[in-house]
């Protein structure tokens, strides 16, 4: 993201944010940030050197400068190899075909943004429980699903973060996710855990400190035990942000999500204005509000005419 766009939204986090975030640094952390940037400049890196990005890497490595440099260098290598630097442009060049697949997939595997949580973070829902993997993999592949994830991370940083930060009046860096496993079979749960691990690998290795809260609701009996098998492969910081809930989740969700922003099906009061609209086509938030859209422009409309914007 260019410096000019960074200048159009807050670059300081809320005073209540965690230590080590922009605006909440100790003298030692400030010195580590300067040294980290200096090393990267010496290595001829020129992109993604803003305070917010560098501090996310430093926090992920507990302000160990050498480990943070190693992580940043590996991420830049991966970005080039995977195509993350051009993934939005590639999508725009193949928008019609990708959107057709995404619209079909949305009915089988609803994934949507719907307003913000109490901290002003984008609120993201995934309804993974009712999917039929055999049918879904006739439309897409796990590889493509992970590529869609990377594309969403890039869209998140480019469009959702700036708009949410302008609305909140302070820097928003993370999201709040609700993963609904209602109806999932235990056999499918193994595949789900494998997918969650792949998602977590990409998240914690290449997009550090983007996860704010991650709620897994309607988790079936035995899921927590299965999760313990995956936990050793996840960063402890990532694990601390994951909350596995059963069917009694409403009270916990409402601690973090305004009742007016939580869909009725999850115990809130939020409904779509047009009864013919579907939540899996929803994309409601500051990133669609002209008051908060800056020089980055409006986020691409993946669902075309289906997208709910108010």
Swiss-Prot record:
Highest taxon, organism lineage: Eukaryota
Domain CRAL-TRIO: 101-274
UniProt GO cellular component terms: nucleus
UniProt organism field: Saccharomyces cerevisiae (strain ATCC 204508 / S288c)
Leader sequence residues: none
UniProt-listed PANTHER family: CRAL-TRIO DOMAIN-CONTAINING PROTEIN YKL091C-RELATED
Extra information: Present with 2870 molecules/cell in log phase SD medium.
Gene Ontology MF terms: phosphatidylcholine binding; phosphatidylinositol binding; phosphatidylinositol transfer activity
Disulphide-bridged cysteine pairs: none
An example Gene Ontology biological process: post-Golgi vesicle-mediated transport
Protein name: CRAL-TRIO domain-containing protein YKL091C
């Amino acid at each position: 993201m260019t410096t000019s766009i960074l200048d159009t939204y807050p670059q300081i986090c809320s005073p209540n944010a965690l230590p080590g975030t922009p605006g909440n640094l100790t003298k030692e952390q400030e010195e580590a940030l300067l040294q980290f940037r200096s090393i990267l400049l010496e290595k001829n890196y020129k992109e993604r050197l803003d305070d917010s990005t560098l501090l996310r890497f430093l926090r992920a490595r507990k302000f160990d400068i050498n480990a943070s440099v190693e992580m940043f260098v590996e991420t830049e290598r991966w970005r080039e190899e995977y195509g993350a630097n051009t993934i939005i442009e590639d999508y725009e060049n193949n928008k019609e075909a990708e959107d057709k697949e995404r619209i079909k997939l949305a009915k089988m595997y609803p994934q949507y943004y719907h307003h913000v949580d109490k901290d002003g973070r984008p609120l993201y829902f995934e309804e993974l429980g009712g999917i039929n993997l055999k049918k879904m993999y006739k439309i897409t592949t796990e590889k493509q699903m992970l590529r869609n994830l990377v594309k969403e991370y890039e869209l998140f940083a480019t469009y959702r973060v700036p708009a949410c930060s302008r609305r909140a009046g302070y820097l928003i860096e993370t999201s709040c996710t609700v993963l609904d496993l209602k109806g999932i079979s235990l056999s499918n749960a193994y595949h789900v855990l494998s997918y969650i691990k792949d998602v977590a690998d990409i998240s914690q290795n290449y997009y550090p400190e983007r996860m704010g809260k991650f709620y897994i609701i309607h988790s079936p009996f035995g899921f927590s035990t299965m999760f313990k098998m995956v936990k050793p492969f996840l960063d402890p910081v990532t694990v601390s942000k994951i909350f596995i809930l059963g069917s009694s989740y409403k009270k916990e969700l409402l601690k973090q999500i305004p009742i007016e922003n939580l869909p009725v099906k999850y115990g809130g009061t939020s409904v779509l204005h047009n009864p013919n609209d579907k939540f899996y086509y929803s994309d409601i938030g500051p990133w669609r509000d002209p008051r908060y859209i800056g020089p980055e422009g409006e986020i691409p409309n993946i669902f075309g005419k289906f997208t709910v914007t108010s």
